[in-house]
């Protein structure tokens, strides 16, 4: 099984994080992750995209260091790395989560 790579907190790059946050769908996923402990592609039913597209967006969030994945059987459970983001970029996540959706 392929174990996903999660960047260490000390290696998070602001440009990668901001790039990941530059997409409205990924912003919605980050908001959902902030409200829930974990999410899977199937629990994001309100997001109207193909499962493969959703998986791609979760991959971008994971590779940027915003999200982490836990694999259990065939399921991938995604969660927000809020503490790591706060440590690396204080206030960034809070600022992003407080922006009204009409300003995305």
Swiss-Prot record:
It comes from Bacillus subtilis (strain 168). Residues 6-100 form the HTH arsR-type domain. GO terms for molecular function: DNA binding; DNA-binding transcription factor activity. It comes from the Bacteria. InterPro entries: ArsR-like_HTH (IPR011991), HTH_ArsR_DNA-bd_dom (IPR001845), HTH_MetalResp_TranReg (IPR051081), WH-like_DNA-bd_sf (IPR036388), WH_DNA-bd_sf (IPR036390). One of its GO terms (biological process) is regulation of DNA-templated transcription. SUPFAM superfamilies: Winged helix' DNA-binding domain. Pfam families: HTH_5. Keywords: DNA-binding, Repressor, Transcription, Transcription regulation. This is Uncharacterized HTH-type transcriptional regulator YczG. The lineage of its organism: Bacteria, Bacillati, Bacillota, Bacilli, Bacillales. PANTHER family: TRANSCRIPTIONAL REGULATOR, ARSR FAMILY (PTHR33154), TRANSCRIPTIONAL REGULATORY PROTEIN (PTHR33154:SF12). Coiled coil: none annotated. Residues 40-63 bind DNA.
């Amino acid at each position: 099984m392929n174990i996903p790579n999660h960047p260490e907190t000390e290696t998070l790059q602001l440009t990668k994080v901001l790039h990941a946050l530059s997409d409205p769908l990924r912003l919605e996923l980050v908001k959902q992750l902030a409200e829930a402990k974990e999410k899977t592609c199937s629990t994001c039913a309100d997001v109207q995209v193909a499962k493969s597209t959703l998986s791609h967006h979760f991959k971008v969030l994971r590779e940027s260091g915003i999200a982490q994945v836990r694999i259990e059987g065939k399921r991938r459970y995604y969660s927000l790395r809020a503490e790591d983001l706060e440590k690396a970029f204080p206030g960034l996540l809070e600022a992003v989560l407080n922006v009204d959706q009409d300003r995305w």
